[in-house]
A protein has these predicted regions:
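Helix-to-loop junction immediately C-terminal to a conserved catalytic motif
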Residues: 53
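Conserved ABC transporter NBD signature motif
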Residues: 61-68, 307
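ABC ATPase NBD coupling module
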Residues: 69-83, 91, 113-120, 124, ...
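Helical segment within the ABC ATPase nucleotide-binding domain
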Residues: 261-273
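Conserved beta-strand-loop-alpha-helix hinge in the C-terminal portion
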Residues: 302-325
Length: 332
């Protein structure tokens, strides 16, 4: 669960150019929720994403992840929990590197070995399958420099990269589970430690029995040992609370209408399949209605409408235009 609590942000404070970007804004986004955000220029949309990602800090208020205050967490540490796609397709990829190299770096983001792009056969096949799902032919262009791809291909690749990250170590999973658990931290620590110890002891016992197995070949023992570890690993990864939150900052605005539609369809597919908590800024009212479970409307640094469920499904572009007109008239 993501909470934006009583956030105020003022730019150029105390000068003739003073601008209140956010005025005591609060909202909560539940796990797996897909929120579209609309509003005019300077209404506070991008400032909200900048504060969530840690690019800038609020003057007042804060950001909470599963009720844990991360307001003062640095941008690089917060990158484990937030992934962002910008309007410019060139921002999300390294143009002088190959498609597969870009994916490899994204796949190691936040990992203990840092950045790098060593790729084994298994990873290469995994990347090909991921790219195949984009239906853009990129699975056949693994060694192509991203700089020569079309804007749509590059943005689709950026979107895929944003959802990738290195699998956290077991130690990191246990630590984050305690940190971000909603209830009593000590109970959470005892619970996850018990699960880990029991699963690890079971894995050790199975591998010891495997060594004593006389009728099994070395190859079969190796294969079985890998299967035992996979079962152990899956038990621990059930406690991983750090699935990334996706921040989309007008990520189709620089694309032609046909390509933008394709990228939006891919966005919907990726978000739903991975159950990603997502906030998507758009100036396209039709897209704001079509996509997502919930719509938030900003005006002059405030949230003036927060629409979800059946109410959102019944929305029309005319409804949204009327809401904007009402907001403007209220200030006259």
């Amino acid at each position: 669960m993501l909470t934006f609590k009583n956030v105020t942000k003022v730019f150029y404070k105390g000068t003739p150019d003073e601008k209140v970007a956010l005025d005591n804004v609060s909202f909560t986004v539940n796990d797996g929720e897909f929120v579209t955000i609309i509003g005019g220029n300077g209404s506070g949309k991008t400032t909200t994403l900048n504060i969530l990602s840690g690019t800038i800090s609020p003057d007042h208020g804060g950001v909470l992840l599963n009720n844990v205050d991360i307001t003062n967490m640095s941008e690089n540490k917060r990158a484990k929990y937030f992934a962002r796609v910008f309007q410019d397709p060139q921002k999300g990829t390294a143009g002088n590197m190959q498609v597969i190299e870009n994916l490899a770096i994204a796949n190691r983001k936040g990992g203990k070995n840092g950045l790098g792009w060593y790729i084994n056969k298994e990873q290469k096949q995994q990347f090909k399958e991921m790219l195949k799902g984009l239906n853009l032919g990129l699975e056949n262009r693994l060694t192509t420099k991203t700089g020569v791809l079309s804007g749509g291909q590059r943005q689709a690749l950026t979107l895929l990269m944003a959802t990738l990250r290195a699998e956290p170590s077991h130690k990191q999973i246990l630590k984050d589970y305690v940190t971000f658990s909603m209830g009593d931290k000590e109970i959470a620590r005892e619970e996850v430690t018990k699960v880990y110890n029991e699963a690890h002891q079971e894995y050790i016992a199975k591998t010891k029995d495997l060594v004593l197995h006389q009728k099994m070949s070395a190859k079969d023992k190796h294969r079985t040992r890998l299967q035992y570890y996979k079962e152990f690993d899956e038990k621990i990864r059930k406690y991983d609370l750090t699935k990334q939150i996706l921040l989309l900052d007008e990520h189709t605005a620089a694309l032609d209408p046909k390509t933008a539609r394709k990228v939006l369809e891919l966005t919907e597919k990726i978000v739903r399949e991975n159950k990603l908590t997502t906030l998507m800024i758009t100036h396209n009212m039709k897209d704001a209605i079509t996509y997502g479970d919930r719509l938030i409307m900003f005006y002059e640094g405030k949230i003036i409408h927060d629409i979800k469920g059946e109410e959102k499904k019944k929305l029309t572009v005319e409804n949204l235009l009327h809401m904007f007109d009402e907001a403007e008239n209220s200030l006259k």
